[in-house]
Amino acid sequence: SQTQSFNFNKFEQNK
């Protein structure tokens, strides 16, 4: 889902 992708992107950026 789009929301899941968005949350995953935020998580990856936070690394």
Curated annotation (Swiss-Prot):
Keyword Glycoprotein: yes
Organism, as annotated: Psophocarpus scandens (Tropical African winged-bean)
Quaternary data: Dimer of two identical or nearly identical subunits of about 32000 apparent MW.
Alphabetical UniProt keywords: Glycoprotein, Lectin
Stated name of the protein: Basic lectin B2
Any GO molecular function: carbohydrate binding
PTM comment text: Glycosylated; contains about 9% carbohydrate. Heterogeneity in carbohydrate composition may result in different isolectin forms.
